[in-house]
Curated annotation (Swiss-Prot):
Pfam families: DUF1478 (PF07349). Belongs to the sapovirus VP3 family. This is Uncharacterized protein VP3. InterPro entries: Sapovirus_VP3.
């Protein structure tokens, strides 16, 4: 017997709620973003020395992104942070090594273009989940999703070049 529409909706809601409950932002990353001494126009620049000196795994990137999303939800106006991230991604991809290797503790060191693409795509997914769970207000969420889409396209073009 096929599931009813209400059962499908309940299953989807349960799945999304379960995923949102697994979002555990790393407190140090959140603190670094909130207390950035360099001002709002370089809110992401702390990432650069971090990834150069200690390559992050995809899991660490995902944790960082969850922190970003929760922060964007608490600021109420994510546009500035998104535009800043949009400007910062090319700096990150130009500066990092473009080789594929193995980092400390077995973490995969990915090509820089791939890193920025993963960053943008994960941010988009995190935003949609946070938006669905009500962590981000409706006007900010809509605007943030549009900006994330343009960021993903920019990252994809850098990855393909």
């Amino acid at each position: 017997m096929a599931p009813t529409q209400s059962q499908s909706r309940a299953t989807t809601r349960w799945s999304l709620t379960r995923l949102a409950q697994q979002v555990r932002p790393h407190p140090t990353l959140l603190l670094l973003i909130r207390s950035n001494p360099m001002g709002p126009h370089s809110a992401w620049s702390w990432l650069l020395p971090l990834v150069q000196s200690n390559p992050m795994s995809l899991r660490q990137y995902a944790t960082a992104l969850q922190s970003f999303v929760l922060l964007l939800g608490t600021t109420g106006c994510p546009r500035e942070l998104f535009l800043d991230l949009y400007r910062f991604i090319p700096t990150l991809t130009r500066t990092l090594l473009t080789s594929l290797g193995c980092g400390p503790g077995g973490a995969v060191v990915l090509r820089s273009g791939y890193r920025s693409l993963v960053l943008a795509c994960s941010l988009g997914v995190s935003l949609l989940l946070s938006y669905h769970q009500g962590l981000i207000p409706r006007p900010s969420g809509t605007q943030a999703c549009c900006l994330t889409l343009s960021l993903m396209l920019a990252s994809l073009s850098q990855f393909l070049s």
